[in-house]
């Protein structure tokens, strides 16, 4: 059996010549062309296996059987239904309570609401403080006139004051890294980092802290840098300016 395509007009013409029910297009054309009409077995395409349809049919059958058992009450005890649906009572009973996150509740622990008095009576954890996170630093103790006078020049006094400040506030001294110029570093954790910022930085390490500072600037700039460092550590601005003035030769002398 062969297949051909015909236009709409020709199709309607052939169909209009049908004389009996079940007459095929081949029979009609043979009759119109006065050709012998043979009994031709109509072509039937081979069935195509579709496993997905079989599975769907199987699930639908199980679903129907499950519903019928629930309605008639003839289901076997201890045997779960093939398919459970939200409408079934068994399914609803099988659903656990919501296990999503609940505020104040951790796995295996149910917290109880606490009053403000209870919270205030609890001890603080290690590292916490009821006061400001910034520890109280006695900045007046930074200047020792005798030792300061023994330092060599403005650079020596500048370095000595920074080293003393690191000893007074070791946990906060990393804030010096926040003191920067326009496109230039004043403090760093390595000599190379300062030299990369400025080849003429003349970096020096602040004691043995691991922090480095540039020293190739004039005295006024050193004073401005020290004032900013002190205020970063929450020193009073007036006191910070007074301490920074000790870098100057006239004041120190």
Swiss-Prot record:
InterPro entries: Arc_rbn_hlx_hlx (IPR013321), Ribbon_hlx_hlx (IPR010985), SeqA (IPR005621), SeqA_DNA-bd_C (IPR026577), SeqA_DNA-bd_C_sf (IPR036835), SeqA_N (IPR033761). The keyword Cytoplasm applies. One of its GO terms (molecular function) is DNA binding. Keywords: Cytoplasm, DNA replication inhibitor, DNA-binding. Residues 154-155 are annotated as: Interaction with DNA. GO terms for cellular component: cytoplasm. GO terms for biological process: negative regulation of DNA-templated DNA replication initiation; regulation of DNA-templated transcription. The keyword Signal does not apply. Residues 66-112 are annotated as: Disordered. Coiled coil: none annotated. It is found in: Cytoplasm. Pfam families: SeqA, SeqA_N. Belongs to the SeqA family. Homodimer. Polymerizes to form helical filaments. Negative regulator of replication initiation, which contributes to regulation of DNA replication and ensures that replication initiation occurs exactly once per chromosome per cell cycle. Binds to pairs of hemimethylated GATC sequences in the oriC region, thus preventing assembly of replication proteins and re-initiation at newly replicated origins. Repression is relieved when the region becomes fully methylated. This is Negative modulator of initiation of replication. It comes from Shewanella denitrificans (strain OS217 / ATCC BAA-1090 / DSM 15013).
């Amino acid at each position: 059996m062969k297949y051909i395509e015909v236009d709409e007009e020709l199709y309607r013409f052939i169909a209009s010549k049908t004389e009996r029910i079940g007459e095929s297009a081949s029979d009609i054309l043979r009759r119109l062309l006065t050709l012998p009409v043979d009994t031709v077995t109509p072509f039937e395409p081979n069935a195509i296996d579709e496993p997905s349809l079989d599975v769907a049919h199987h699930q639908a059958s199980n679903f129907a059987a499950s519903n019928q058992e629930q309605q008639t009450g003839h289901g076997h005890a201890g045997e779960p239904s093939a398919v459970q649906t939200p409408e079934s009572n068994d399914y609803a009973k099988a659903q656990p309570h919501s296990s999503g996150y609940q505020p104040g509740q951790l796995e295996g622990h149910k917290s109880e609401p606490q009053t403000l008095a209870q919270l205030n009576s609890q001890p603080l954890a290690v590292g916490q403080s009821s006061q400001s996170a910034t520890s109280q630093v006695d900045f007046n103790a930074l200047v020792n006139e005798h030792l300061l006078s023994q330092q060599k020049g403005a650079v020596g006094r500048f370095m000595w004051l920074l080293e003393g400040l690191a000893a007074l506030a070791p946990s906060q001294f990393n804030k010096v890294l926040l003191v920067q110029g326009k496109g230039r570093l004043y403090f760093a954790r390595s000599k190379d980092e300062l030299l990369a910022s400025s080849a003429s930085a003349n970096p020096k390490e602040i004691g043995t802290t691991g922090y480095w500072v540039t020293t190739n600037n004039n005295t006024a700039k050193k004073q401005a840098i020290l004032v900013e460092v002190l205020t970063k550590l929450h020193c009073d601005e007036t006191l910070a300016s007074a301490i920074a003035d000790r870098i100057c030769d006239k004041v120190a002398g």
